[in-house]
Each structure stands twice: as structure tokens, then as C-alpha cells.
């Protein structure tokens, strides 16, 4: 019996598998744009478990499953027994008998790992406080479709060393690029996988200009992520000087791309003239969530495809 593959963090797949996913995403995006039908998942069902609200995650997975010929079911804490304390292990046992694949967006990475450990079908991490692999998968594809391989490039992260930043670090190690992180004291990137990352993979600084200098990608996120609202005032003060401005973008390469996972707060972590400017690819990132997730779902359920 073939073992079930899950996608719980970026390091779960190999460079060759990512190369396949990027090429497959390109094909699926082109087909969708041309109006071609590609429905290899007719009769397949995805259960989507949400403990954290979302716009892009829900819409991209629902639309993606529909385009592949399958169906996606939405479950949240109000409409399921999860909100009443049912163990996630029991939820996994039930959902994996009625679904072909599960996506979960929640708070704790440990919850996702427990779900996967008791599931008969693939589990995809739609977001946790620790990692956001589907977002970074889409971000890197957005770079790849414009400039080719990201290997040997430099990505600058300005702001909170959060789940997206932590996922960028895993991606740097897997795909061979460098991540430069600028964060204020107390909000630095904390690795959780026990790995030591050399200077060829990770550089940390307090200075945004140093991080952005010579970068191919400049990216950031909100200062206060979901679940940390009580810290909003303290965070706003701590992150003063960490806004991505047009002046800061001048430190990057002229062809550098600006990325943001959204939702964005103009005038806080990014200036309006940057996110709405010519170097910004945030809307392409959002769309590409759907395309890369389609490729990922197809790969986890059907394996390597060339059709």
C-alpha cells in the first residue's frame, strides 16, 4: 500500500517535486486562462476545516477543486463538532473516511500534525501560527513565472518573524536561495525545526535597508497577525521604521518584486505607492494560490502527471 503524502510544511517536498509543481502550475494556469476543461478529480471530495477565518484560502481551494472537477466542503467551529471539543484524532478518522483529501487552517501546527497522523488521506496545511506553506509556494511560483529559477537569489523579509517568514526560511534551505530578515528586538525569526541555517541561507539584522540591499524579492506581512490582536499597540510601536517604502525599495535590485500575502494595511507595514506600484505582484500572488494548490492537490492524489 502506498503511504499517504501530506503537505504540512515547506520542507515536506524535495527540490525535484517543487520543480514539477511549478511546471504543473504553469500548465494548469494556462489551461484555465484558455478556458480548457481539466477535470481529473471528478467524484473527489475535499474537507476544508477552518478554525481561522480566511478569504483567499477558502476561495482558492474551493475554486481550485471545482475547476479540477471535485467538490470542497467547508467546516468551521460553528458548524461542526470541532468547536465543541471533539478530539482532532476523531475528526481525522471520520473525515478521511468520507473525503479524499483534507485541508486545515488553524492555530497550532501540532493540531495539523495530529490530524495527519490519524488520517487515511492527504492533509494540507492551509495555515498555522508556525507555517504557511501554500502561501510561499504561490509566492515562489509568482517569481518563477517571471524570472525563472529562484536558486541563488536573495529574498528580503521586513517585519515580524512570523509563520510566513519561517516558511520562507524552509524554502530557502530547500530551493537554494538566501533569506535576509530585518526585525525589531523581540520579534525576530525563531526556527522551530531544530536546524542550523548557515550564512548562505539566512542573514538576520535590525536594519531594513541592509536586508533589502540587492534583493530580488522584498516581502512583508501585517505587524499584527490573527490571534495576536491584544498586542496590536505594542507591535505598532515596535515596528516603527519597518514599513516597506518606495525609498526602501530603491535598495533592492531595479527588477525586484514586492510581495505581500494579504490582507495588507497600507500606511503600516507597506506604503500605498509600493503595494499599488509597478513592482508589486500581490494580486498575482493571490491568484497563484489557486493554481499552485491545484497542482499540489493533483500531485498528492494522482502523483506526477504530464497530460
Swiss-Prot record:
Its EC number is 2.1.3.3. Transmembrane segments: none annotated. Coiled coil: none annotated. GO terms for molecular function: amino acid binding; ornithine carbamoyltransferase activity. L-ornithine binds at residues 163, 221, 225-226. Pfam families: OTCace (PF00185), OTCace_N (PF02729). Keywords: Amino-acid biosynthesis, Arginine biosynthesis, Cytoplasm, Transferase. GO terms for cellular component: cytoplasm. It comes from the Bacteria. It is found in: Cytoplasm. One of its GO terms (biological process) is arginine biosynthetic process via ornithine. The keyword Lyase does not apply. Carbamoyl phosphate binds at residues 54-57, 81, 105, 132-135, 261-262, 289. Gene3D superfamilies: Aspartate/ornithine carbamoyltransferase. It is an enzyme of class 2 (transferase). Pathway: Amino-acid biosynthesis; L-arginine biosynthesis; L-arginine from L-ornithine and carbamoyl phosphate: step 1/3. It catalyses: carbamoyl phosphate + L-ornithine = L-citrulline + phosphate + H(+). PANTHER family: ORNITHINE CARBAMOYLTRANSFERASE, MITOCHONDRIAL, ORNITHINE TRANSCARBAMYLASE, MITOCHONDRIAL. Reversibly catalyzes the transfer of the carbamoyl group from carbamoyl phosphate (CP) to the N(epsilon) atom of ornithine (ORN) to produce L-citrulline. Belongs to the aspartate/ornithine carbamoyltransferase superfamily. OTCase family. This is Ornithine carbamoyltransferase. It comes from Chromobacterium violaceum (strain ATCC 12472 / DSM 30191 / JCM 1249 / CCUG 213 / NBRC 12614 / NCIMB 9131 / NCTC 9757 / MK). The gene is argF.
